[in-house]
Every structure is written in structure tokens, then in C-alpha cells.
Amino acid sequence: MADFGADEASSKSESPEQEDQGSEDRSLLHQRLAIRELIDTEVSYLHTLRLCASDIRSHLQQLPPGDLDILFSNIDDIIQVSSRFLRGLQETACREEEQAHLIGNLFLEFQEEFEQVYKVYCANYDQALLLVKAYQKEPELQKEIQGIIEAAMPQAGPSGLSFFLVIPLQRITKYPLLLQKILENTPADASAHPALQRATSALQDVNGNINEYKMRKEVALKYTKVEQLSLRERLARINTHTLSKKTTRLSQMLKQEAGLVSRTEDKEFDDLEERFQWVSLCVKELRNNVVDFMGNLEVFLSFRPHERSLDIPGGPAEQYCSLARDLQLHAFLQFKQRLRSLVWQPLCSLARALAGPQNLIKKRLDKLLDFDRVEEKLLDVGSVTWEEEAARHEYQALNSLLVAELPQFNQLVMQWLGQILCTFVVLQRDLADQVLRRAESTMALLPHHHVSEPDFQKLLEHTLGQSSSQLRLFQESFEKVLPPSTTQPLLPGSEHQMQALLTRYGPEKLYQVSSNINGTGTLDLTLLRGQIVALLQNKDTKGNNSRWLVDTGGHRGYVPAGKLQLYHPIIPSEKELRGQTGTHEDSWLPAPEPTQLSVPTVPTMSQVVAVYPFVARSTHELSLQAGQPVTILEAQDKKGNPEWSLVEANGQRGYVPSNFLARTPSPTPWGWNLPS
């Protein structure tokens, strides 16, 4: 009896220790079961993802273009991350004592990757569900999709595509629960406890960040939708709420501009927006340049001299026509097609991609006004309404989205822009190589193919110089035998300039430009047809008589001598002065240089015509057409203003601007003589 009592007392004293040991064993068992559940479910999850990406997606190619990208989003990225994560989980099995600690560190290692891949998928999930609902409204398509799913995974049931699409969302939200289960069965003094605790908190933060990102994307999607609305539809959307909101924002903006209230400043966003606007300007400039280049290319291809009959049988001319025809039909056509598909179309897509962020930036400015107003009210009153709090959070979400996404967007646009420029350069180089290859066989037949490039350049310059001299001689010969060219009317507003040149240099030095002159050198002038200049020297510094030094009254420079005609003022006779009350301006008519050849000339008489069309704005004015002859009754209005002239045309009288009129010569019928 004494021994039995001693054993009983001993068993009672050992029972608390045994209970503690049993509790630890149960916790360890539950921990290992939780770890086993984590690994087994990860294996099943990855298998389902691969099945969805391979068997199901590959058999849904009959869906409209682009739908597969929306349905399955970045599932390939999720598979890649999950594969590496599962491999890491399986490697922890060989170190059973440290397995819980290794799993906690593994989750911390994959924290950022989980957030990056799952936030994209979760943000696109709602759009994928909209597509699934749209497919359900088409019985034949839905039946075909259901057959594909049942063949791949019979346990999916009637839920169809939505069964697979929701799996990644369920998995990322289950990670914190699985970690929490492992953590609960890990002693607080165990070495794995801190790592598991950090991992659980990190995965909870990941889910919170994903939800916040999804909310931002929903706000962005709301304001990036481009709606093509007519004016009637836009007016129909205006209501009292819209007017009140616009008025409040305008009032807030005016108070900020006046300095009555403060404005929220965000230096980080301002820098990003400036960068975005600069990138947008680069895209716009490049697009305009490509448009001009393609237009010039079309003009270049429209000229086809090889299709003309040159009347030069055989020789280099025939070889050139053959080469030009080959380039026109093959090399240039291929270059044009590649330019459109590889440069123009991507550039247009890039320009369209800028519209969404641009709309978000504009909408952010509106939301910033609402935010500042709510913040001001919150400081004054201490509380805001539910709608005002929602507007406040909407601005914060929109601003956070832009600050987070604009740097990456700007970088991608610059990379895209650089690729387009590189492609354009490569296309130019390929075209040059094609032209050289096609010209090699023809070049061997040309008379100067054996000449070196420097010698060929000298030969080319010499030939062009000779041709230019011959053309100049031909031009001078034709100018001597041709009748005098038609006198050009004076440019509007050039009368005072002509008077100054006449006073300074005299009538014998006055010349009028017979055709437009485009200066190409640093000392060359660009002049318009009809402009009056004064001759300073009839040759240039090298003694070339074909270039004259002239004065326009403001600038001095060289112009081609062949484009100048000598002019003298024509003084109207007393009869003409009596026949007209006055003229608005003195007119200067050309007198051709006397030539040695006897050429019949046509006598001319002075005539006042409208140089430009004029539309009357009142009953006191007279409408005129360009070139319409008029009779000047008074060279000023009733107040003596010479800028208006009273004229008569077609039996009607009225005032017209004086600088719209010019005196031009008109041929006199043969046999008539001007009165002496």
C-alpha cells in the first residue's frame, strides 16, 4: 500500500510536465500539418494555373482579338513567380527543424514579386468578368467554352471560366491565413516566430496594397475613357449638380490665384508632369516630321522621268531609265510600305497612348481644387460630409497613381520613341543598300565608272559649271529676242519705299523684280515679285556680271541680274488728271531696256485695277474682284484720309482701301494712238 501511494504521488508530480510536452507535440504536429497544407495547395494551385494557360487558353482562339489578353491578363508572370516560390518551399522540406523559419524568410523574399504580379491581375479581373458575362449572352459561344473547360477539368462545374479566373485572387488572399495558422502553432520563444510574424504582416500589407492599387486603377479607368459625344449629348449632360461643381471649382481657383487661400504644392508630381509634357512634345514633333517626310516621299515618287520619252536611244539614258524603273517598282515601294508599318503606325499608337495620362492629369487639377476646398473646410469646421470625404480620397488615389505610374510611363515612352527613331534610321540605311546593290550592275556600264570619287566630284562640278554657263547664254539670247515682259503691279504699301529709293538714287537706278527670288547665300536677298530695288553695283566682288548688288531700302545684298527690269515713273497727263479727281498713289510702270534687235512692240495705256478682292462691309464701300478695272474719283475720303479712295466700277460707287489698287499697263488695240 505504501508503494502504491508513492507511485501515485510521483505520477501526480510528473503530469504537468507531461501535459506541457504533449501540448508542444500537438502544436508541432499542427504546425507541420499547416506547412504541408501550404505546400500541397501550392502544388495544386500551380497545376491549375498551367492547365488554364495551356489547355484552356490555347483552345479559345476563336474569341475576338484582344479578349484573351484581358481574360488571362499576366497569368504567365504569375506562373513563373509561383514556380520559383514552390521550388523554394519544397527545398525547405529537407531541413525540417528550420522549415518554419525558412518559410517565413521565403515569403519575405517573394513579397515584392507577389505584389507586382498579382496587382496587375487583380486590377484587370473586373474587366475579365464583364467579358465572361458577355459570353453568357451568346448560347453557342458559351456552350463551346463550357465544353473546352469540362474537357480540361471536369470538376470545374457549370461556373465555367469564372472558376479559373478567380483562383489567383483566392490564392493571394489565402497566403496570410496560411501563415497565420503556422504562426499560431509556433511557440513564441521559437527562432521561427519573428520571421513568421514579419511574413504574415508583409503578406497582409501586400493584399492591402493590391486593393489600393485596384481602387486607383478603377478611378483611372473612369477618367481615361474617351467618349465621342456630340454637342447635343454634351449639353444633355449638364445639370444643376454639374453647374454647382464647376462653379465651386472656379471660385476656388480664383481665390487661389488672388492669394486668398493656399494651394497644395507637390514638387514630385510637378517634375513628373513637366517630364511627361516634354515627352509628349517630342512625340508630337516626331509625328509631324514623319508626316512631312511621307508627304515629300509621295511628291518624290510622283515624278517619274524614266516614263518620259527622252528621244535618246541607248547609252546612259536608257540605263538610267531601267534603273529608275526598277527602283520605283521595288526598292522605293518596299521602303514606303515598311515606313508606314514600322514607323508611322507605331508612332500613331504611341500618340494615342498619351491621351489617357493627359486626361488623368487634367482631371487631377479639378480634383485638387476639390481637395483644397475640403481641406480648408476641415480646418475651419472640423468635419466634412460623406461626399466631400469621397472627393478627398479620390484626389489622393488619383495623385498617388500618377506619382507611382508616370515615371515608368515616361521611361517606356522614351524607349518606344528611341526604337522608332532607330527603326527609321535602319530603314534609310536598308534603302541606301538596296539602291547601291541594284545600281552595281548598271554602274559598270556607265562611261565614268572607273573614275575615283574625288575625281568624279571634280568632273561633275566642271560639267555642271559648263551647263550652267550654256543655260545662262541661252537665257540672255532669249531675253534679247522676246517681247518685253508684262509689268508687275506694285506691292501694296511699297509706295513710300519707292519714293525713298527714287529720292536717294534717282529713276535710272530703279529696278523691279520680275519673279520671286529665294536667296541661298549669306549675302543673297529674298525678294518678292513686283518689289522695287535700287542698283548699287552691276557685279559681285568676283566680277560676276550675273549677280548685282542692290538696296531694298532696308537691306543690301546680291540678286540675279536676269530677274531685274529697269523702271521709270510715268507722270500722268493733264487730261488724265482732269478726268480723275485724284489717285490714291503714284504708280510706276516699267520701261524695257532698249535692245539692238528690231521687235514689234505693243503700245500700252495706264489702267487702275484692284490687286486684291475686297468685300464691302457697309453701303459706303464697294465690293471688288481681283483684276477688276476701276475709275478713281477721289484719292481720299471725306476726312482727307488717303488710305481710302472713292472709285467707280460697273456703274457703282464706293470707298475701297487705297493699297488694294494699282496702276497697270493694258495693251492698246492695234491702230490706236495715245493722245499727245
Swiss-Prot record:
GO molecular function per UniProt: guanyl-nucleotide exchange factor activity
Keywords: Guanine-nucleotide releasing factor, Repeat, SH3 domain
PROSITE patterns per the UniProt record, alphabetical: BAR, DH_2, SH3
Repeat as UniProt keyword: yes
A GO CC term assigned to this protein in UniProt: cytoplasm
Domain SH3 positions: 506-569, 603-666
The keyword Repeat is annotated on this UniProt entry: yes
Domain BAR: 254-455
Segments forming domain DH: 30-213
UniProt xrefs under InterPro entries: AH/BAR_dom_sf, ARHGEF37_SH3_2, ARHGEF37_SH3_C1, BAR_dom, DBL_dom_sf, DH_dom, Dynamin-Rho_GEF, SH3-like_dom_sf
Region (Disordered): 1-26
PANTHER family per record: NUCLEAR FUSION PROTEIN FUS2, RHO GUANINE NUCLEOTIDE EXCHANGE FACTOR 37
Function of the protein: May act as a guanine nucleotide exchange factor (GEF).
Full protein name: Rho guanine nucleotide exchange factor 37
Organism listed in the record: Mus musculus (Mouse)
